Every structure is written in C-alpha cells, then in structure tokens.
Amino acid sequence: MKSVTRCIALLGGSFDPVHNGHVALADYFVALLKPDELRVIPAGNPWQKHGLQASGQDRMAMVRSAFSTQKVTVNIDQQEILRPSATYTIDTLRAIRQELGPHASIVFLMGADQLQHLNTWQEWQHMFDYAHICAASRPGFAMDAAHIPTEVAQEFTRRTGTPEQIRTTPQGLAYLAPNLAVDISATAIRAALQRGERPTSQLPLGVLDYIEQHHLYKS
C-alpha cells in the first residue's frame, strides 16, 4: 500500500458560538497527532439542530479568531455553510476524501456530546470508510452503554488504533481520549449572553469581543 502523504484533522460543529471546549479538543489532538493541517468546518443547516442563532459569516469570523493561535496550519472550510440542503457529516467526509485522494490520513475530531449521539447520525458507520474518528470522552466516563451507545462502543473497540497508526493510515480507525472533555455548553453560553453576562472562562477573548461588538445572542 502506498504510504500516507499527509494528515488532515477535521473539526466540525455548529460553533454557535465556538468556545473553549472546541479549542481544547483541537489543541489535544493537534499535539497528539501532529497533523499537517487543521480544517475547521462550521455547520450549515445541520439536520439535527433547528435554528442557528448566529449567521454563517459571524460563525466563520468567530472560528477564525478562536483558532488563530494554533501551532498548525488552520483552514476554515465553508462547504457546509454553502450547501443549500441539510448538512450531513458523511457527505462532507466523502467530498474531502475525493478532494484529498486515497493516500491522505483524514481524522474527524468529535466532542463527547457528539459521541453520545453518534448512532443517530446519517450513515455513521460509513464515516470510517472515509476517515478515522478521534473522540473525547467526558471526565470519568467509561466506554460503556450508560454513556456511549452500545453499537458505537463496539465499533470504537473493534477499530481502536494508536495515534501513530492513525497518522500513517488513510481511514478506518478510532481513538478515544479519556478525561478530555471540557464541560461547556453553547446553549448555556447563549443564555448567559442574553442575560448580559460575560462568560470569560468559557469563550476565547477574541470571540467574546466579536460577540459584543456585533451584538450577537441578544434577545
């Protein structure tokens, strides 16, 4: 098999707003995998979520600010924002695999809250046909059915790989980072902002500045 040419880490999300939990997830896996690029993908119209509060343009600007100090090349991918129909991660992974070719390692990064609902995602098991999946787990959470759906736990156990294997193979492996998850809720942040609070411990300073300058998340 031809050797892997490069490693691209993908971080998708609504980022409404992007917060320190997202940044911590990226920081951890950038240090672990040393990818050649971190590609951040703000969601367009996610099929599971109703009514993003900030516009695509505002969310892109906040993401750009939040990830400006990364020790890796960061690119903001607009494909989901530009997609006119409902957004499915499987479609994004197919498109990126087609773009990068068969010999790139593609690593999809996932937060603990996403992992808990992965079995409801469109064609979730086929995501491994196009990428590796690296996920955070909440502090103290074991890989068990109480916290992670049984079929997801089984798939992760069956596919578990080392960081080195993930970095040097194209797709198909899984990695769970225990005790990584930072318990920050975008919903709670929006509620705090609507009350006029400044959640400085939960948001990158540049993101909070942007929110205040553009009067986002006001009732």
From Swiss-Prot:
Any one GO biological process: NAD biosynthetic process
Molecular-function annotations in GO: ATP binding; nicotinate-nucleotide adenylyltransferase activity
Catalytically driven reaction(s): nicotinate beta-D-ribonucleotide + ATP + H(+) = deamido-NAD(+) + diphosphate
Pfam families reported for this sequence: CTP_transf_like
Top enzyme class: transferase
Pathway recorded for this protein: Cofactor biosynthesis; NAD(+) biosynthesis; deamido-NAD(+) from nicotinate D-ribonucleotide: step 1/1
InterPro entries according to UniProt: Cyt_trans-like, NadD/NMNAT, Rossmann-like_a/b/a_fold
CDD domains membership: NMNAT (cd02165)
Record bears the keyword Disulfide bond: no
Protein EC: 2.7.7.18
Its biological purpose: Catalyzes the reversible adenylation of nicotinate mononucleotide (NaMN) to nicotinic acid adenine dinucleotide (NaAD).
Family classification: Belongs to the NadD family.
Protein name in UniProt: Probable nicotinate-nucleotide adenylyltransferase
